[in-house]
């Protein structure tokens, strides 16, 4: 496994309060962005990818550990965190590997799993994946983007929008000028 050259000596001399033990599977654009954000929040992160060069790049930039290999493999995940992680986020380009990675993580004791699933054929199976397979969350980036664009278009002149109660309610802020009939 790769480890951060500075972190091993720093951890020995400084007291760190680590928020969560997180495994990120897949170091594409999404995986790299998540790693950057989660590392900035001082989480204990292990990244898994089949490309050792990507792992080395990430490990040299952020205070994370890296494992080369298939994130859907039991042996690879077992090496990431003994006793399971708090969270596994699978962001590879393969829906099937993302699902498998989440299943393996659950069996290893990981509390929460998030899978990036892009194939619309799996849309009807999302409830099954959550309820029966134990996935905490399924994210479809294209669908989420389309939903956000549609939400912005509903209130194009709004300054700010906040959603509540699992997106069932929305609070919208507008700037009203003095000549507005509502004033």
Put a short name on every predicted segment.
Residues 9-183:
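Cytosolic regulatory regions of ion transport systems
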């Amino acid at each position: 496994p790769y480890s951060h050259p500075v972190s091993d000596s720093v951890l020995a001399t400084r007291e760190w309060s680590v928020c969560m033990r997180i495994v990120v599977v897949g170091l594409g654009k999404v995986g790299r962005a998540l790693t950057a954000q989660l590392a900035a929040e001082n989480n204990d992160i292990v990244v898994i990818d089949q490309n050792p060069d990507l792992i080395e790049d990430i490990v040299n930039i952020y205070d994370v550990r890296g494992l080369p290999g298939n994130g859907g493999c039991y042996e690879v995940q077992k090496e990431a965190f003994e006793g399971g992680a708090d969270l596994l986020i699978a962001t590879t380009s393969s829906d099937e590997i993302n699902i498998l990675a989440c299943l393996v993580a659950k069996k290893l004791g990981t509390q929460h799993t998030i899978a990036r699933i892009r194939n619309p054929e799996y849309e009807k199976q999302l409830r099954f994946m959550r309820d029966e397979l134990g996935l905490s969350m399924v994210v479809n980036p294209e669908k989420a983007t389309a939903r956000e664009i549609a939400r912005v278009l509903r209130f194009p002149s709004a300054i700010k929008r906040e959603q509540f109660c699992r997106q069932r309610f929305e609070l919208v802020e507008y700037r009203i000028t003095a000549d507005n009939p509502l004033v």
